[in-house]
Amino acid sequence: MCFYYKKDFFEKTLHYIDFKLNKIIEIAKLALRKGCIIRWFEPSSACSKNIIEYGFVSLNSGKIVKIKKLKNCMAFLHALQLTKENKHSLVFEYTKNDIPIIRFSADSNCTCQSVTYNENIIVTAPHHGSSANANVYKSIKGDNIIWVRSDNEYKNNKRPCQEFKDRMNNYCLACCKYNFVSEICFEYNTWHKQWDYISGQRCRCK
């Protein structure tokens, strides 16, 4: 049988696969109901911009155009585990017409090149503003950057890191020792060519 392997590994692997596959299946269902096209990406060690469409650009990944055939069942199980390493998180930028860039950092430490933005852009803080990703704030430069972070807890000593707190324009969905807010809203002002803060919560973490 192809399932001949260490029992603990097999049980843990199946549990992890089941958990992750259910997440993927749910996302796929929601996408199909909305008529969205589903695409698969794989991480790339090289930092290069790959234009996708609809204004999205991938910064550290490439679109999978050909599915690789796996040799055996165990290779299939290993492939399904999906990496837990945050460095493999995919980073995307979105821009359309004259709207400045919105950068989605996920949990990535994407710092292979230093970038300076001259326009008023929005960047999501990588890994909820974790100290493990603190070097990102040195590699992404600009005077008008708006940093936004989400979190599901507000008593984590490692986030947000001091580098996030030191940013001039920073916003939190969950500030330390303060209540959660449901959303942070910005609206693009075409006249002044900038993002206007509408509602939410400025960072009050200390």
Where are these regions (language model features)?
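Flexible, acidic/histidine-containing loops and adjacent segments that form or flank the divalent-metal
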Residues: 1-101, 179-180, 189-206
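C-terminal regulatory/interaction regions
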Residues: 108, 156-206
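Short, structured coil/loop segments at alpha-helix boundaries
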Residues: 18-21, 135-137, 157-161
